[in-house]
Amino acid sequence: MSGDHLFSPFQLQQHILKNRIGVAPMTRMSSQQDSVPRQDVLDFLVRRAENGAAMVYTEAIVTDYESAQGYPGQARILTQRQIDAWRPVVAKIKAAGALAIMQIFHCGRMGWPEVNPAGRIIAPSAVAPAQ
């Protein structure tokens, strides 16, 4: 396939990617009680890189403590323990020749106030989306 560029190297800003295959972010709601991602989630992301993906997006990572969480099980990267959990994953993804990309996430109006640490929803609009 002479016109197929899927498996050819690609430059993305300063990064040279081995191909154009990326693993889309998946919000799996699989973190522990303290919002540290479980080991099986981290292993899953590393395996995607080891199996040939050039870009591996994390699942949705909550942006702050009080307002971004919208439902149970969301990972964060705010405390040192959370940062330390993500650090080896990024290193292993890079060691496999892939680029680790974090999906920064804020739930906004779609959040559940009962699971948000602040007990409220913060969003740019007061209009609730249709359910």
Where are these regions (language model features)?
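N-terminal capping/small domains of soluble enzymes
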Residues: M1-C107
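Non-globular sequence segments
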Residues: A91-K94, L99, F105-Q131
